């Protein structure tokens, strides 16, 4: 009897998996890569942070910038982003820390003492017209300094201002960069240097202490670079739009508007871990890791005592390639799923979105070296035996922030909920850094072998006989991430480098991000599902209402790169109307209410008015494709598949060379080739559904359908030039076959799409 094979569409959910490898070369190579990534995250921490105001009372900030030395001047040539009338600075505040190379008494002075008050810690050292006071500074200590400048009705644009000091040897000089350090802008709950900060005199209106004045966070600001200095200034649309600068708004009461570990100021000025993705440098896009695993291969063997294992049994293994897709399940947690018409406005409703991070891995369905025998027959597995599982995997981070010292806990699940093993990663399975869009181990290195439940490989991952048979039948495993431990790297203001905080844990931060953001999942690029979280208002939480309103249109632009050429919202040339929207029930009710208030009948026309709220769940998918319950593309409309195959570069009796869109390639299981005679009788060349994979991708990106691959390695033989050669494409949604009891495995029952049909004399 022929072995029954079932072609399963690739289905996968996001997860993370543990590593266990003794490959020292792999470890050493990864450590070098990790150290390089971490060391790249540097910027200067030297100097003072300055705020320049157009009014006398520190209420109208025009520029926020840092100066590396005691030369705190801003020439008018660097103020082109500010309206001319606001370039006359009447007040300024500088803050930071000062340190000395030798203990001594110092006297401070400026180029405008008559307009200056200055403190070192709590001691006043300059008070406008009065004489400066000496202060003793000790080597090795950091002293907080604050300078206030006020000058009514200045006559020149910009500001010419220098800070000097004089030691006991009466040597006066502009304070150098080695002696100045930027302030540490911690959240107000911090109990570090904030305790000994001076409260003398007016302060910058900055309630959340993120470094951005409150008025700018509310009204809008932008960041530009002039002569190697970052300038944060109020948003002026008629100036900044022409330069292509980005307008930011953020909460004046949240140090991090998106609730991630990076302040709004750190994000927009670049004082941040350089491994954070570009889109998450926006204060309203959350920076956080999403860690999955890609399983590349699975090896199954009989679980035997090594001391009694004979030579023959050592070769009785099953090795299969696997594939993993990252998915988000739309479901109600009662095994039911609802997809209802959303009032014909361009959306649909799912009963719920799964929040679990898991991955379903599809095992290759092609013929094994053992021929037609079952897996159990190949391995000599009997009902009383158990089988060992060895998986080859890689970690991958599809989020927007790096995670350090990664230690996950993962369950391997068969079927719906048969847990084969739950494995907690140990220190020797740790990945030092997993940056966004990076793999561990990297693709040029061997994958990790996962084959044991403990540190000493004494407890293998096993399956009983019935579980083994189920795995062969379904050819699927699910990997659930129960939890993941990993550290955060933050900017160190003392040395300008990123430092991994070993006391931090992403698992403590992620719940706060999830509670205060809207989640959007989008599959626009290569049909890969990408999740992003955007800061959004929670009307029932007073603090969260201080965030700027966020529209669905703006969220798509800042998180996914949508743009508006000719006023139409597009993604990589595709109009927004080519995508559909899917909401969970709570989100759909919110959207429905907003549409009613707007008197709108089509969501696409009011995307700039639909406001996001925290905890919304929105899935946006390419309309051309069909999806399974995990939102993986498994098919497409027939017209779409045909259109994708219309560009045949050349054809012959050896095969077809085509130029096929990579999105279409992802949904194809393969092709069926047949010869049709003049009376309409058809003979399938590859008439087994495990022989559909007769195509290959060439280095130039073109697809070749090889007629010889399952035709005894010979070109097609066409006895009559008027006979037709028909080629059909088969999508993944049409390859779940239930063979008949007599073992029939023909392709007769497969739904197929005709993509090529020519007579023999036409193909040469």
From Swiss-Prot:
Site, as annotated: Alpha-clamp: 207, 216, 265, 493
Q: Which gene encodes it?
A: pagA
Q: What is the effect of changing residue 721 to A?
A: No effect on toxicity
Residues forming the PA14 domain are: 43-179
Which family would the database say this protein is a member of? Belongs to the bacterial binary toxin family.
- Outcome reported for the amino acid change (mutating residue 236 to S): Abolished interaction with LF
Annotated protein name in UniProt: Protective antigen
Result, substituting residue 451 to C? Loss of capability to undergo conformational changes that lead to pore formation and translocation
Quick one: where's region Alpha-clamp?
231-239
Q: Where is this region: Disordered?
A: 176-214, 302-333
Effect of mutating residue 239 to A: Decrease in the ability to bind to LF and partially toxic at high concentrations
**Organism in which the protein naturally occurs:** Bacillus anthracis
Q: Which PROSITE patterns match?
A: PA14
Relate the outcome reported for changing residue 711 to A.
Answer: Loss of toxicity due to decrease in cell binding
Which N-terminal stretch is annotated as signal sequence?
Answer: 1-29
Kindly list the GO CC terms recorded for this protein.
Answer: extracellular region; host cell cytosol; host cell endosome membrane; host cell plasma membrane; membrane
Looking at the keywords, is Nuclease present?
no
- From what superkingdom does this record's organism come? Bacteria
Q: What does this protein do?
A: Protective antigen constitutes one of the three proteins composing the anthrax toxin; it mediates attachment to host cells and translocation of edema factor (EF) and lethal factor (LF) into the host cytoplasm. PA associated with LF forms the lethal toxin (LeTx) and causes death when injected; PA associated with EF forms the edema toxin (EdTx) and produces edema. PA induces immunity to infection with anthrax.
Q: What is the effect of changing residue 714 to A?
A: No effect on toxicity
């Amino acid at each position: 009897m022929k072995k029954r094979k079932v072609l399963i569409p690739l289905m996968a959910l996001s997860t993370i998996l543990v590593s266990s490898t003794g490959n020292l070369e792999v470890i050493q190579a990864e450590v070098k890569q990790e150290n390089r990534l971490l060391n790249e995250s540097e910027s200067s921490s030297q100097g003072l942070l300055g705020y320049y105001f157009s009014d006398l009372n520190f209420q109208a900030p025009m520029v926020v910038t840092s100066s590396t030395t005691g030369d705190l001047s801003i020439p008018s040539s660097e103020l082109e982003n500010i309206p001319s009338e606001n370039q006359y600075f009447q007040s300024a505040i500088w803050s930071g820390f000062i340190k000395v190379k030798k203990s001594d008494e110092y006297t401070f002075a400026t180029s405008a003492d008559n307009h200056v008050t200055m403190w070192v810690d709590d001691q006043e050292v300059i008070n406008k017209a009065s004489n400066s006071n000496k202060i003793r500074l000790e080597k090795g200590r950091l002293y907080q300094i604050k300078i206030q400048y006020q000058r009514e009705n200045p006559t020149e644009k910009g500001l010419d201002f220098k800070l000097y000091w004089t030691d006991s040897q009466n040597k006066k000089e502009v304070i150098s960069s080695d002696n100045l350090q930027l302030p540490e802008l911690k959240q107000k709950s911090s109990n570090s240097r904030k305790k000994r900060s001076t409260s003398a005199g007016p302060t910058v209106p900055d309630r959340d202490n993120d470094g951005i004045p409150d008025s700018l966070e509310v009204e809008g600001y932008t960041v530009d670079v002039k002569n190697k200095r970052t300038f944060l200034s109020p948003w002026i649309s008629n100036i900044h739009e022409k330069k292509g600068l980005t307008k930011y708004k953020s909460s004046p009461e949240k140090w991090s508007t998106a609730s991630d570990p990076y302040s709004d100021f750190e994000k927009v000025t670049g004082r941040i871990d350089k491994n954070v993705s570009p889109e998450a440098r926006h204060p309203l896009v959350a920076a956080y890791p999403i860690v999955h695993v890609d399983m590349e291969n699975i090896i199954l063997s009989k679980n035997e005592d090594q001391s009694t294992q004979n030579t023959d049994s050592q070769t009785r293994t099953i090795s299969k390639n696997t594939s993993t897709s990252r998915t988000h399940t739309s479901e109600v947690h009662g095994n039911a799923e609802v997809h209802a018409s959303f009032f014909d406005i361009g959306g649909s409703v799912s009963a719920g979105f799964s929040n679990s991070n898991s991955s379903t891995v599809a095992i290759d369905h092609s013929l094994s070296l053992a021929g037609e025998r079952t897996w159990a027959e190949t391995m000599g597995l009997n009902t009383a035996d158990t089988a060992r599982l060895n998986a080859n995997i890689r970690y991958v981070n599809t989020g927007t922030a790096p995670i350090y010292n990664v230690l996950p806990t993962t369950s391997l699940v068969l079927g719906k909920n048969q847990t084969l093993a739950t494995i907690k990663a140990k220190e020797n399975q740790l990945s030092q850094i997993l940056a966004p869009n990076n793999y561990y181990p990297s693709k040029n290195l061997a994958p990790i072998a996962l084959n044991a439940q403990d540190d000493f490989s004494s407890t293998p991952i096993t399956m009983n006989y019935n579980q083994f048979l189920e795995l062969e039948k379904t050819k699927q495993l699910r990997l659930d991430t129960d939890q993941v431990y990993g550290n955060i790297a933050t900017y160190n203001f003392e040395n300008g480098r990123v430092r991994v905080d070993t006391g931090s844990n992403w698992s403590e931060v992620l719940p706060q991000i999830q509670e205060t953001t809207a989640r959007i999942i989008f599959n626009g690029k290569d049909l890969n599902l990408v999740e992003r979280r955007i800061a959004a208002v929670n009307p029932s939480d007073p603090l969260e209402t201080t965030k700027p309103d966020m529209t669905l249109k703006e969220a798509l632009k800042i998180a996914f790169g949508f743009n508006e050429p000719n006023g139409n919202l597009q993604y990589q040339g595709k109009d927004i109307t080519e995508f559909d929207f899917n909401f969970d029930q709570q989100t759909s009710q919110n959207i429905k209410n907003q549409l009613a208030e707007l008197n709108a009948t089509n969501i696409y026309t009011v995307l700039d008015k639909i406001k996001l709220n925290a905890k919304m769940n929105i899935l946006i998918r390419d309309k051309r494709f069909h999806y399974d319950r995990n939102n993986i593309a498994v098919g497409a409309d027939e017209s779409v598949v045909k259109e994708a195959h219309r560009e045949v570069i050349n054809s012959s009796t050896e095969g077809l060379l085509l130029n096929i869109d990579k999105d279409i390639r992802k949904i194809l299981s393969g092709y069926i080739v047949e010869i049709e005679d003049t009376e309409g009788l058809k003979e399938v060349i590859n008439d087994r559904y495990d022989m559909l994979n007769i195509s290959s991708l060439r280095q130039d990106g073109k697809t070749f359908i090889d007629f010889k691959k399952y035709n005894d390695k010979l070109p097609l033989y066409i006895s009559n030039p008027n006979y037709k050669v028909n080629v059909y494409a088969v999508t993944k949604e049409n390859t779940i076959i239930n063979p008949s009891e007599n073992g029939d495995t023909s392709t007769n029952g497969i739904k197929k799409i005709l993509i090529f049909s020519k007579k023999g004399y036409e193909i040469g």
